[in-house]
Structures are given as C-alpha cells and as structure tokens.
C-alpha cells in the first residue's frame, strides 16, 4: 500500500464539476492499493500517515504530525501509484489490487484515519480533478 502525502494549506477534489471533498490545512493523501495489501497494511500506513512529523514546530523544524496541528486529511484513491514503470514507455498496472479489494481497503484506510482526524475523500474509481496548495512544497512517498 502506497501513500503519496503532500502538506497542504488547502485542497479539494471535484467530480463532474462538483466539489466532493475539501480541506483547509493538513494532508492530501493519494492512496494506491496493491494486490498483496491487507487491513494490517492499511493499519500500518494509517498510523504512519497520522504520526509522520512533517509540520513545523515553533522553531519551524518538522517535528509535528497532522494530529498535533489539528489538521485534516483529503484522501483520494490513485491506482496509478501501483504502476510498474520499470520497462518500456507505458506503465503496467499488474501490481494494482482488483477494484473490489482496492475499494474495500481504501474505505478501511479512510475509516481508520477518521478515528483520529477529520477526513474528506474523493470518489473511488471516478475521474477526479484535484487542486491543492502544497505548503513548502512538502511531499513524501510512503509504502508499507
């Protein structure tokens, strides 16, 4: 399971011209689910995302996590994170989880994060337009 996390001052996701999820300060989480992923991996990744210290303290040192800053999450499914880009000029998605498993684990991840912070989401398997203001920019790729 892969999360591309971006520290944002604001982010939103639109589907068919309608905003379906929007946050102020916090993290935009692009979530990719792979074939071998499980609820245990989702638990580990949720814990890591929620506790990853990428927000500035009073000395502007990355020492605080999203919970400590009263931040929010915008979680957006992104199967392309599971792409194999090692060969050729076209990505292979053979490592990606089947849609039913991917949706189940995506929803589970959202639920786990929602136990600790406010979470907004995109729409699974939809064409989405994501806009954000990356604060920093600060972006990390997390994999469990």
Swiss-Prot record:
Give the superkingdom in one word.
Bacteria
Q: Describe, as the record does, how this protein assembles with itself and its partners.
A: Homodimer.
Q: Where does the motif Gly-cisPro motif, important for rejection of L-amino acids lie? A: 136-137
Reactions catalysed, semicolon-separated, are: glycyl-tRNA(Ala) + H2O = tRNA(Ala) + glycine + H(+); a D-aminoacyl-tRNA + H2O = a tRNA + a D-alpha-amino acid + H(+)
Which gene produces this protein? dtd
Function per UniProt: An aminoacyl-tRNA editing enzyme that deacylates mischarged D-aminoacyl-tRNAs. Also deacylates mischarged glycyl-tRNA(Ala), protecting cells against glycine mischarging by AlaRS. Acts via tRNA-based rather than protein-based catalysis; rejects L-amino acids rather than detecting D-amino acids in the active site. By recycling D-aminoacyl-tRNA to D-amino acids and free tRNA molecules, this enzyme counteracts the toxicity associated with the formation of D-aminoacyl-tRNA entities in vivo and helps enforce protein L-homochirality.
Keywords associated with the record = Cytoplasm, Hydrolase, RNA-binding, tRNA-binding
**Domain comment quoted from the record:** A Gly-cisPro motif from one monomer fits into the active site of the other monomer to allow specific chiral rejection of L-amino acids.
State which Enzyme Commission number(s) the record gives.
3.1.1.96
| Top-tier EC class | hydrolase
Q: Major place of localization? A: cytoplasm
Quote the InterPro entries the UniProt record gives: Daa-tRNA_deacyls_DTD, DTD-like_sf
Name used for this protein in its record = D-aminoacyl-tRNA deacylase
Q: Where in the cell is it found?
A: Cytoplasm
Q: Which family does it belong to?
A: Belongs to the DTD family.
Task: Cite a single GO MF annotation.
Answer: Ser(Gly)-tRNA(Ala) hydrolase activity
Biological-process GO terms, alphabetical: D-amino acid catabolic process
Query: In the UniProt record, which is one GO cellular component term?
Result: cytoplasm
What Pfam families does the database record attribute to this sequence? Tyr_Deacylase (PF02580)
